């Protein structure tokens, strides 16, 4: 959606591969630019039904045994696609292989994550993880200081760029389109693990991701979707009680953040807190965006 100015670099990085571009009603000329500059790419236009819906559509438009999924603000480095495929070929139960993510300036963009629990939500929203970034107790939500330099099975990884095995996609099922913008990868990896599949981090392949470089991309709407994704995951996989306890923890954390931070950032947290306060969790997840 509105992928300029990065989508051209995204497509150049996978030149020569079968390419599907799913557009969610862009108004910035993305579709026209892609069709003019990359005539071999298949462009699929649909209304903005969310990230999960776009991934599902793109994967279904090809019959390839592996599909590399890229955000429109991410691109692979060098022969990363070949590296990911060769690695996956050697591990038959590898459902999802994540490359190491870099910021545009070449610095590491941490991407390994842990499945949400009420406690892990508390460590995030109450800043407990800041006390001991490498602690498994206080920072498992963000990988407990994982160095991102070793091959490792992980709970899930940020989905700006990833290789997915079609066999796993067919067995586990599509991405849950109830997750509009956040936590769809979390949910899918959780279901994949339950079905005996593995999510792996492979640092020998790299991709650049622009979106993670600044919190300012988290407008009030985007931040609310992040909170909604966390609550939806907990409701789906941990139950009503866990989701409601998490909602109360999130509310306390957002109230704290709205005091600590000033200006635009503080306003984002205040608006999100007002929305969370209108709970319970089940009602929030039924509300329109």
Residue ranges and their predicted role:
Residues 4-5, 13, 23-32, 77:
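A conserved acidic beta->alpha catalytic loop
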Residues 17-25, 44-45:
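Short beta-strand/loop segment that forms part of the nucleotide-sugar
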Residues 46-62:
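Glycine-rich, basic loop-to-helix element that forms the pyrophosphate-binding segment
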Residues 67:
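Short aromatic/hydrophobic "clamp" motif used to bind/position activated sugar donors
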Residues 77-111:
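Conserved donor NDP-sugar-binding/catalytic core segment of glycosyltransferases
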Residues 116-154:
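Short, flexible, basic/aromatic active-site loop/helix in glycosyltransferases
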Residues 147-149, 155-206:
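A short, conserved alpha-helix in the catalytic core of glycosyltransferases
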Residues 221-231, 235, 240-289:
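Non-catalytic, C-terminal membrane-associated alpha-helical segments of glycosyltransferases
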């Amino acid at each position: 959606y509105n992928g300029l100015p990065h989508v051209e670099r995204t497509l150049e990085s996978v030149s020569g591969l079968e390419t599907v571009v799913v557009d969610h009603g862009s108004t910035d000329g993305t579709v026209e630019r892609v069709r003019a500059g990359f005539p071999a790419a298949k462009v699929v236009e649909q209304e903005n039904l969310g990230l999960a819906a776009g991934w599902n559509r793109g994967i279904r438009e090809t019959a390839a045994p592996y599909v590399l999924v890229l955000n429109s603000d991410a691109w692979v480095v060098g022969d990363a696609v070949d590296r990911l495929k060769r690695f996956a070929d050697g591990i038959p139960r590898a459902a999802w292989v994540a490359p190491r993510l870099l910021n545009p300036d070449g610095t590491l963009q941490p991407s390994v994550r842990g499945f949400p629990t009420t406690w892990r939500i508390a460590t995030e929203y109450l800043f407990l993880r800041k006390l001991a970034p490498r602690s498994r107790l206080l920072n498992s939500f963000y990988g407990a200081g994982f160095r991102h330099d070793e091959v490792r099975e992980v709970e899930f990884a940020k989905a700006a760029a990833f290789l997915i095995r079609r066999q796993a996609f067919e067995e586990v099922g599509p991405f849950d389109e109830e997750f509009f913008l956040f936590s769809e990868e979390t949910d899918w990896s959780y279901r994949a693990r339950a079905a005996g599949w593995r999510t792996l981090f492979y640092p020998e392949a790299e991709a650049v991701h622009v979106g993670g470089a600044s919190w300012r991309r988290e407008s009030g709407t985007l931040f609310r979707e992040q909170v909604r994704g966390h609550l939806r995951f907990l409701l789906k996989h941990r139950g009503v009680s866990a989701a409601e306890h998490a909602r109360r923890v999130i509310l306390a954390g957002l109230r704290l953040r709205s005091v600590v931070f000033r200006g635009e950032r503080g306003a984002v947290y205040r608006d999100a807190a007002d929305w969370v306060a209108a709970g319970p969790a089940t009602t929030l997840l039924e509300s329109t965006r």
